[in-house]
Amino acid sequence: MKFTKIFTGLLLAMMLFVTPAQAQRSQSADDPSGFVVLGEFIPDIIQEIRYYTTYNFVGEKIDGYEMPCALMTIEAAEALKKVSDDVMKMGYRLKIFDAYRPQMGVDHFMRWAANVNDTRMKKYFYPKIAKDRIIPEGYVAVKSGHSRGSTVDLTLFDMKTGKDVDMGGTFDYFGEKSHPDYKKITKTQYKNRMILRNVMIKHGFKPLAEEWWHFTLKDEPYPDTYFTFPVKLLQK
């Protein structure tokens, strides 16, 4: 009887102590019910959804981007709202380039990368990278963390100047210059990168070593699900 009571107590304690990783959920890849529209959830953000336009490394509107809006999981959006509140106090707003990316968009990237003759945007986004090296060097891949819904590409917008903060490099540039710790930039540019990086880390996001603009919620709710629904306003 004593052993039974001890075992029951341990079991109850284990049930009560659930880590974020243990709280991960499974969901159908075509089900957007765990997502929100960032512009509605965080009204202060600015959205410049590059893959809805032709100004991106592919040079054409990307499959799956039906509207120029950003979507994220509820958990990631809640964390990003805290980031937004913090940077607003510093005189900045968040500018979003991309968030949730449907798998069909990733597939579009792969088709483009396989066509080595299409280099129309090379001088803007990958001037120092041969087109046939884009896949081997990992600039695009068959799966993207963006498709799990808790990754965001963003920068800071200075409310005083009315311009993007100078990060010493541009969004989606393929090369060492995009690494957060790249040394051949000014102290001010590096400081700006660190302002963004530190506030994102503070609120539960982890950075990427190759891209200063890229962050993923550390305790993302769907770490194994690559969603397929298109980017558009969600039905309420």
List where the protein language model places each region.
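Extracytoplasmic cell-surface/polysaccharide-interacting catalytic and binding patches
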Residues: 22-99, 106-107, 111-210, 220-236
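Conserved metal-phosphate-binding beta-hairpin within the catalytic cores
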Residues: 215
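Bacterial N-terminal signal peptides
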Residues: 8-18
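Positively charged n-region of N-terminal signal peptides that target proteins for export
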Residues: 1-6
